[in-house]
């Protein structure tokens, strides 16, 4: 009988060690670029011929793309601490009213998912995402969260990060993206393997136009100031 408590203690020690290792890894990414992401490995396993991913510092990414992503994905990024409770409440009310299912994922949550987790909708994955979100919000500055997000986001089959996306879709570095190009890239983020910024459908063109209008609000109200103009 004494073997069971001993086994449980060993399992607890292993789990605690694994948790500490993951925390140390997450904290290290404040300074060290992630070498890849679980989704990149999944895409390779699914048969992608390769991964086009070129890490660049945030200063080498057009401010237009920063504004576009904030406008389309998380307009309160600079003011929340990982979870946008207003968006959560709005999504709940919308879904309860019978509208098309809407999420409330913030840029911080998407960064946590992209850097550490697999694409899934299980409660286990969601719980892990919440934990990593709170961890990076506590240990990374907002500017770093945005930098990692923009370098890990998927923008097409085997295309990851703003630099690879800009070069593959528009033939230019991410630093030179125009406002219109940035809006198109942001417009396809919900499903970048289905939609293309190079050959936008009418829906994507309309979505990009809406994002461009919101980008003006982002600039006017300083909604991306924590990324573009940190104190």
From Swiss-Prot:
Coiled coil: none annotated. It comes from Rhodospirillum centenum (strain ATCC 51521 / SW). The lineage of its organism: Bacteria, Pseudomonadati, Pseudomonadota, Alphaproteobacteria, Rhodospirillales. One of its GO terms (molecular function) is peptidoglycan glycosyltransferase activity. InterPro entries: Glyco_trans_51, Lysozyme-like_dom_sf, PBP_transglycosylase, Pep_trsgly. It catalyses: [GlcNAc-(1->4)-Mur2Ac(oyl-L-Ala-gamma-D-Glu-L-Lys-D-Ala-D-Ala)](n)-di-trans,octa-cis-undecaprenyl diphosphate + beta-D-GlcNAc-(1->4)-Mur2Ac(oyl-L-Ala-gamma-D-Glu-L-Lys-D-Ala-D-Ala)-di-trans,octa-cis-undecaprenyl diphosphate = [GlcNAc-(1->4)-Mur2Ac(oyl-L-Ala-gamma-D-Glu-L-Lys-D-Ala-D-Ala)](n+1)-di-trans,octa-cis-undecaprenyl diphosphate + di-trans,octa-cis-undecaprenyl diphosphate + H(+). HAMAP family: PGT_MtgA (MF_00766). Keywords: Cell inner membrane, Cell membrane, Cell shape, Cell wall biogenesis/degradation, Glycosyltransferase, Membrane, Peptidoglycan synthesis, Transferase, Transmembrane, Transmembrane helix. This is Biosynthetic peptidoglycan transglycosylase. It is a single-pass membrane protein. Peptidoglycan polymerase that catalyzes glycan chain elongation from lipid-linked precursors. The chain crosses the membrane at residues 12-34.
């Amino acid at each position: 009988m004494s073997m069971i408590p001993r086994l449980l203690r060993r399992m607890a020690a292993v789990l605690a060690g694994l948790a500490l290792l993951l925390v140390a890894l997450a904290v290290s990414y404040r300074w060290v670029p992630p070498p890849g992401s679980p989704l990149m490995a999944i895409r390779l396993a699914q048969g992608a011929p390769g991964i086009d991913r070129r890490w660049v510092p945030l200063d080498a990414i057009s401010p237009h793309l920063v504004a576009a992503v904030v406008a389309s994905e998380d307009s309160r990024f600079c003011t929340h601490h990982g979870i946008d409770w207003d968006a959560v409440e709005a999504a709940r009310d919308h879904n309860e009213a019978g509208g098309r299912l809407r999420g409330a994922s913030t840029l911080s949550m998407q960064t946590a998912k992209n850097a550490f987790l697999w694409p899934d909708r299980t409660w286990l994955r969601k719980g892990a995402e919440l934990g990593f979100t709170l961890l990076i919000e506590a240990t990374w500055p907002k500017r770093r969260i945005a930098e990692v997000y923009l370098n890990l986001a998927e923008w097409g089959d085997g295309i990851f990060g703003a630099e690879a996306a800009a070069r593959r879709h528009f033939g230019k570095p991410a630093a030179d993206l125009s406002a219109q190009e940035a809006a198109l890239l942001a417009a396809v983020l919900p499903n970048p393997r289905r939609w293309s910024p190079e050959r936008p459908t009418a829906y994507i063109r309309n979505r990009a136009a809406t994002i461009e209008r919101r980008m003006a609000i982002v600039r006017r109200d300083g909604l991306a100031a924590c990324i573009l103009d940190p104190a």
